[in-house]
Amino acid sequence: MLVKADMTKDIAQVMAEVGRKAKAAAAPLSIATSEQKNKALNAAADAILEARADILEANRLDLANAEKNGMAASFVDRLTLNEARIDAIAEGIRTIATLPDPVGEVIAEWDRPNGLHIERVRTPLGVIGVIYESRPNVTADAGALCLKAGNAVILRGGSDSAHSSAAIHKALVKGLEAANLPADAIQIVPVTDRAAVGEMLKGLGGAIDVIVPRGGKSLVARVQSEARVPVFAHLEGICHLYIDKSADLDMARRIALDAKMRRTGICGAAETLLVDRAVASTHLAPILGDLAAGGCEIRGSAEVLALYPAAKPATEEDWSTEYLDAIISVALVDGISGAIDHINRYSSHHTEAIVAEDAQTVARFFNEIDSAILLHNASTQFADGGEFGMGAEIGIATGKMHARGPVGVEQLTSFKYRVRGSGQVRG
């Protein structure tokens, strides 16, 4: 149950207790069998479907507050739950249950000349703190992924989705209880005060092993600045789509429309369209016409405006903006070299896509752009753990340490070495 900050215990005490419970739950969870964890996940999926009416009612409360507070349409879309999205949440949890258990997997093994046999084996990270904004589905995704990887998790969602997240969390706890796993293995921060985030970033007295922020630039920047524990960071999704002169126009039109407009409020939505200057006279107008017909605002460079006068002028700020809305910035570039230069200058290193048929051009795109996910002849909206076969994701990591790209069950593990001998001494 979520409560306000005016309580008998102060925030630090409350959060210290949350950390203590998570640490205690992490030990038995780390040695839970695959069967136990899968039973908990499937039971949680059942509980979510059984609680459908309660979850939708809780979501209605959150949506009413969002409307009262005048939140943007893209924000409301991320917050909204409906029958189909609840079905998808439950199905995502079931899919995670079907994934191979990473815990105990032997990643590598070798023998030494002295007879020692060495194995590198996956282990849980321990306790993961997940701080996210108003996406109720993250409550389920993060809880389920951490459970599958044998980690306890502390969930701190945005206050705007508090009712929805609490209803989903209740179902996750039912799943744990059905498998005789500790209910404290998946906790939701019981206070809405933002001071709770500060306590999590301090590590809760050594209880938290890693923090995963999932949200806007200001949230992630705060986490990176203040965290005293390791962070899997995802700053923002300034994703680019480049249409090369070798591209099939019909394919380019389909991909551009999907990459921008399928869901505008997700981090994998394309925010900048780059078109090879060599085909601008034939390709630009059809592609932008499709986007405009779909309700997208076009912001173009001076060259783009000359070819497509319906566009609005783009400013320098547009090239580094994550709109999360039906807006796209458009520029012409000198082939693959121009596209690479633009992307490496403005990208957040999340996801970039190219539409092209020339193999050498595609090879340069893959080799010379340093982003977590690169796609060829496919929409940027495939930048998703579920689409990668991971069941779901806890976020898209844009850093380079430990995890990069979709953070699924494998990325939520560490490893240890098991060394087997037969009496060897170094002497």
Curated annotation (Swiss-Prot):
Enzyme class: oxidoreductase
Pathway in which the depicted protein is active: Amino-acid biosynthesis; L-proline biosynthesis; L-glutamate 5-semialdehyde from L-glutamate: step 2/2
Chief site of localization: cytoplasm
Protein's UniProt keywords contain Oxidoreductase: yes
Stored CDD domains: ALDH_F18-19_ProA-GPR (cd07079)
Listed EC numbers: 1.2.1.41
Transmembrane regions listed in the UniProt entry: none
Domain of life: Bacteria
Entry GO MF terms: glutamate-5-semialdehyde dehydrogenase activity; NADP binding
Subcellular location: Cytoplasm
One cellular component (GO) term of this entry: cytoplasm
Substrates-to-products reaction catalysed: L-glutamate 5-semialdehyde + phosphate + NADP(+) = L-glutamyl 5-phosphate + NADPH + H(+)
Pfam families xref list: Aldedh
Alphabetical GO biological process terms: L-proline biosynthetic process
Function per UniProt: Catalyzes the NADPH-dependent reduction of L-glutamate 5-phosphate into L-glutamate 5-semialdehyde and phosphate. The product spontaneously undergoes cyclization to form 1-pyrroline-5-carboxylate.
Family: Belongs to the gamma-glutamyl phosphate reductase family.
UniProt cross-references to NCBIfam families, sorted A to Z: PRK00197.1, proA
Annotated protein name in UniProt: Gamma-glutamyl phosphate reductase
Organism field: Brucella ovis (strain ATCC 25840 / 63/290 / NCTC 10512)
